[in-house]
Amino acid sequence: MSRQALVTIDLSDINSPRQLHAALAAALGFPSFYGMNWDAFWDAVTGLVDMPQQLELRGWPAFAARLPDEAAILQHILARMAQEMPDLAAQVHYA
């Protein structure tokens, strides 16, 4: 499977962790059995799907203000993947 060049996820209407996981799953092509939690997110991005070359998280500042804990966890997981699996990780743009 080849990696997409760019995936953009609009976070401006995300107001709950469930909405966030649904948006991530839809945009990144997670399987239907995705568990909608951070452990499942890690499993999905590191072994179930090919991450895009670039991932743009649009509306990040307002999203991070609304859901700071979720934003911190997402940012941490994406940074961890970039450190541990640089060839598979997306270059993330927090826009």
Task: Please describe what each predicted stretch is.
Residues 1-95:
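Positively charged, polar, low-complexity stretches
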